[in-house]
């Protein structure tokens, strides 16, 4: 199986590598050497590389090359996006899978897996930002020219919205979660002013009627 990884420990950054092409024609070995040069960056011992994602290759002065194999040139440069994560987090994911009787072929950043599932090639080409809102984190992946430009994780998720609803409406957490799912709206203008919802109170008090627009705002 392929196991997904996410969380606030995930970090992404851009790097590049440059090599001299041997023989005047780009070979698989040249591409491998360029990628090795790009990933030759200092990474803390408690982190590991999850992905090295090529953004573009440059052969001499030709930019924007997706696959330089077989091209003539003397200088090969590659720009990459490197994703790293905590070693212990990756190990715990693998161990959990093994305990369930599953063999892990590889670990994949969840936002990249989501992008493969929901984004079209055209969207990735013209530029798009994928935002995956989870319970505790918000995963972000930005694409342009059909390559990854940025990945990031915000320590904010659906649970934060639930907490805000519970605090703002003085209602239990379980009730706040149900209200969010059933009545939540991201744009207040899309809610009719005559829409009302029932909000349970804490401490056994009577439930209250509240405008749905107040919730959306």
Model-derived features with residue positions:
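Glycine-rich phosphate-binding loop of actin/hexokinase-like ATP-binding domains
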Residues: 126-168
